[in-house]
Amino acid sequence: NNKFVNSILSIGELSLPQKLSLYLKIMSKGNINAFTLQQTEEVKKFLENIPSFPLDVSIAAYYLNINNITYGQYLKYLNDYNQEIENAQEDILKEVGDYTKTRYQIITLSLQQIMASHKDFKDLLLFISLFDSQNIPRDLLNSYKDKIIVDNFIHHLKKYSLITHELSSSLPVFSIHRSTQAIALTYLTKTLNLEKNKKTLEPVISSLEKYMADTLEKPSILLIKLFVSHCEV
């Protein structure tokens, strides 16, 4: 019931120092002084590309510790997400604890629940999976679906911790972690059979063309720059 749902503990995102501390403790088995200053700086740069949740940081640490691969190779695995990396991560989780749900499983379950909430949310999920994951303008979604639907959609994305808001921006925008977006696109491509159903993308293209025309008519350099960054993707 609703009382039970509202009582569930929500684990927020970790700060970079928290991510670093967790990663180093796992990699060095508690002896964080085992890393040199240069190695620590390299870890920081690596962790900037890892979703800021304990599960993601833990899996990254255990995976690199067991397989002895480079940071670049691991990030490539995340970007080229497939069933093999999914199985490998699940095996690692089984070895280190009783929890076996990987990031892919968590995100796809969240996507399923979001799509079940409203008939238009499936279209909006696909829509935001096709652009640059950073600084997506709210107006871009408003040009595709009704504003009330978009507001509700954003609420659901935030509810499942799939997005972050850029409070410092002068325009209402939000961002998705790149690996989260990659997982979403992989899942939606398979679920919607996009390889064969190319017509599914036609409304997206039509909406994008309209938004482009409207944007170019507005005297906002920032808005135009944002739009160009998404077109380049």
Regions of interest found by a model, annotated:
Residues 1-233:
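Aliphatic-rich helical/repeat scaffold segments used for oligomerization and domain docking
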